């Protein structure tokens, strides 16, 4: 198994996360924590994200940003899992163009060459942007999962090239791919 959690709203008042919360997730079996627009709301996370490769921030945050937005992990069965964390542009003003970042990413990394599976966590506000990213990565990823806490999880799809997409997962404590 390989567990990815979007933990950006796990801290008090539902904004950000802390080192302690990350460690609690890891102790529960989480392999990777992704984030979104609330990644920096708990300032202590800025130091921790620099040293913790299992904690990702959106790759398309304005540079220079602490941490990383993509990492390749190996499972117990030696399967290489790439996890890419992206954030939408609609109503999210802290990031570069998600499609340009995605295009650059796909020119640098290839499914099966660099990793066996690619999980894309797309943190965004609107369903149409999540669907557009799903189609953008169709055939280039294993799955695309849309995260944020504003819409219900009721829209799983298998796209033309056989990859599933889900525009929304549950909150951090239940957000498992």
Which sequence ranges carry the predicted segments?
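Acidic, metal/ion-coordinating pockets
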Residues: 1-177
């Amino acid at each position: 198994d390989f567990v990815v959690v979007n933990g950006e709203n796990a801290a008090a008042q539902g904004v950000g996360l802390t080192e302690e919360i990350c460690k609690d997730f890891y102790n529960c079996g989480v392999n990777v924590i992704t984030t979104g627009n609330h990644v920096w709301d708990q300032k202590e996370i800025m130091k921790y994200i620099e040293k913790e490769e299992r904690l990702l921030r959106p790759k398309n945050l304005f540079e220079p940003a602490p941490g990383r937005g993509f990492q390749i992990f190996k499972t117990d069965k030696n399967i290489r899992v790439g996890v890419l964390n992206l954030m939408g542009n609609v109503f999210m003003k802290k990031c570069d163009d998600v499609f340009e970042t995605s295009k650059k990413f796909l020119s640098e990394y290839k499914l099966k060459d660099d990793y066996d599976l690619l999980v894309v966590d797309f943190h965004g506000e609107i369903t149409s942007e999540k669907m557009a990213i799903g189609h953008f990565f169709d055939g280039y990823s294993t799955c695309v999962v849309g995260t944020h806490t504003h819409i219900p999880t009721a829209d799983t799809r298998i796209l033309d090239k056989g990859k599933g997409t889900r525009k929304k997962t549950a909150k951090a404590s239940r957000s498992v791919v």
